[in-house]
Structures are given as C-alpha cells and as structure tokens.
Amino acid sequence: MNNWKRIVVKVGTSSITDGRGSPSGEKILSLVKECVKLIRADKELVLVSSGAIASGREIIQKLSKRKDLPAKQALSAVGQVRLMQYYSQLFSIFKQPIAQILLTAEDLRDRKRYINISQTFETLLEEKIIPIVNENDTVAVEEIKIGDNDTLSAKVACAINADLLVILSDVEGLYSEDPNISSNALLITDVYEIDESIEKIAGPGKGTGGMFTKVQAAKIVTEAGIPMILARADVENILERIVLKKEKVGTFFYPSEKHLNKRKHWMLFMAKPEGRIYIDDGAKDALLKRGKSLLPVGIKKVEGEFTRGDTVSIFDLRGEEIARGITNYDSLELDKIKGKNTEEIRNILGEDFYEEVIHRNNLVLTNRGDL
C-alpha cells in the first residue's frame, strides 16, 4: 500500500442518519473528527456526502411521503442547507474550513468545465480546505443526473487525481454472496480485476446505493490507476485505521495495471457520446488488434447529430459498442464520406480534410480486456 496523500471519502445516507432517517449529530461528529485527524496528518481530503433529502424530510415532513421528482428536488434544496449547517458547525469546533461543491453529470461531461472543476478542487486542497461534494439534485433532471454518490465519488477522485477512494457503507465490504441471505457469505478482501464474476456478485439492477453502484465506482477509479477501499462506516476510527495505520479493512480494489491516461479515461467514463458510428469488420480489426485510427473507408452507417470535437460511440455491425473517440468530422460531413477512400473524399470535400475520422490518440476501447 502506498503513502496516500489525496483521499476521497464517500459516506452514504445511512452512515450519517439515525434509525428514524434523520441526520445524526453523533454520527456526523464522529466523521468530522476522523476527517480532521487526516488533515492534521498532512493529508488532502474531499468528502462526498449523501443525506440532503433525509435532512430535508426532517424539516418539511409533509413532502416526505411524496415520490415525485419536484418533491425530491425541493427536499434536497432545503436539506442540503441543513446538512451543510451540521458540517459547518461541527467542523468549526476544530477550526477546519470547508467548502460546498454541487455537481451534475453535465459538469463532468463538458471537457472545459471538467478541467475548471479540477482546478477549483486543486486550489481548495492546497489551502487545506475540505470540499464537501454532493450531486446538485435540485437541477439534475434525468439527462444530467449522475444518479448516485458512489459514481459521483469515483468521478471526483479521477478529476482530482486522488491517491485513494474510500467508500464507507453499512456493510463490511464485498461478499461472495448476500450476507443477509446466506450464512456461507465470505468477505472478499482483495479484488485484483473487476471482471464478470465480480460484477455478477454485485448483482443486477442499477440501484442508487447498492453493491452494483459500488463495484461500478471501483471500475471507474481502478481504470484511472486509483485504488478503492469499501468498508463499514460505523467501525471506530475507520479512516485512521485505513489511511494512517494502513490496516487491512474491508475490500481493497487494486488499480488496473493497464490504466488509462486522464484524457482517455474522461472519454470513456465522463463524456456523453453524441452519436454512433457503425464500422465493418476490417475497421474493427484495425482498431482492436492493430491499434489503428478510424478511417472513413471502414464506416458503414452514421447515427445522430454531432459536431467536430464531440465524443461518439463506435459500434460493430452486430450492434456491440467497441470504442469511443473524439471525431474530426461532424455527422453531415461523415455521412457524405463514409465508405470512401482518400481520392473520393478529396473530390467531395476538396483538399482540406482529415485522413482519420478519429485518430488513435483520441480513441479508447470500451472493452478493456481487448487491450
């Protein structure tokens, strides 16, 4: 284990609320003490905290029974203020400054905003300020929702080049089976690769806080070369034991040996594909087996509307996504030159054109096992 300097810690709602679902001052104080301990040990810390909606229910009880989106967003708007009051009051006891950052998926999909957010985090961390992060539920309609704070914490960890992501939960780690159902369930202490067997253990269904989202979070960070630890939140001094004492706790997800550079990682996990390009088997082999750029001649079909510089998905003729990349052509241009060779393209577009639709430096394979 390395000497981790920059750590992202994610806590779920159950880790900071009481049995009635209301924010627990005792639990939050315990978390605050742990965070301060890390800062005083010269660590840099980002805290991704759920609990806004639960905090809102405490204040506006008549909305708490409604399940519609506007009610949830109203609860989040009220609850986020209440949650930050808890954190502000308790961190102030230790004279520890904090900041609030609310994000949507759109903030991370847009490359310029992504870089700007990274720089904001950088400045806060340099000043020993703890950013407290949550999804901006009040404005996050379905199209721009990140969806869960496990995923959010993983994307934040990648954006700031963290050394470690710690997800604190109500379970000790990843088990071989559901420990609530099977007495034969065993704690998996080490995960070296997130393959189909690990994803199967995590279960189906893309819930907003279950084991599936935690394993997907691990997949995001490990592909960026960042390890992740999944551990139980209510274990005494859990962060000190993990970060400072380097104790073996919970499940440790090891970083991928062939992890992606930051740009390609952003393309695969952050950017939203604006269209689809379908390619023939020859072009597929060139991408997967020979590491080549994508040329117009291998393209069979173009779907969607996109402009130069957008991220697009690349599919084979069987409908399987094989890669993503940044296109040199917009969808109208590409539709004109698909399947054409260089001379034919010159006759269509003139002398000013790109030989590659997507250069290999701007292309990343979606199935990392193909690398």
Swiss-Prot record:
Binding site for ATP: 10, 169-170, 208-214
Transmembrane parts of this sequence: none
Pathway note: Amino-acid biosynthesis; L-proline biosynthesis; L-glutamate 5-semialdehyde from L-glutamate: step 1/2
EC number: 2.7.2.11
Compartment(s) of residence: Cytoplasm
InterPro entries: AceGlu_kinase-like_sf, Asp/Glu/Uridylate_kinase, G5K_ProB, Glu/AcGlu_kinase, Glu_5kinase, Glu_5kinase/COase_Synthase, PUA, PUA-like_sf
CDD domains: AAK_G5K_ProB, PUA_G5K
This protein's UniProt keywords: Amino-acid biosynthesis, ATP-binding, Cytoplasm, Kinase, Nucleotide-binding, Proline biosynthesis, Transferase
A cellular component annotation (GO) from this entry: cytosol
Catalysis: reaction(s): L-glutamate + ATP = L-glutamyl 5-phosphate + ADP
Sequence ranges assigned to domain PUA in this UniProt record: 274-352
Similarity comment: family membership: Belongs to the glutamate 5-kinase family.
HAMAP family named among the record's database cross-references: ProB (MF_00456)
Protein name (record): Glutamate 5-kinase
Source species: Dictyoglomus turgidum (strain DSM 6724 / Z-1310)
Taxonomic placement: Bacteria, Pseudomonadati, Dictyoglomota, Dictyoglomia, Dictyoglomales
Gene field: proB
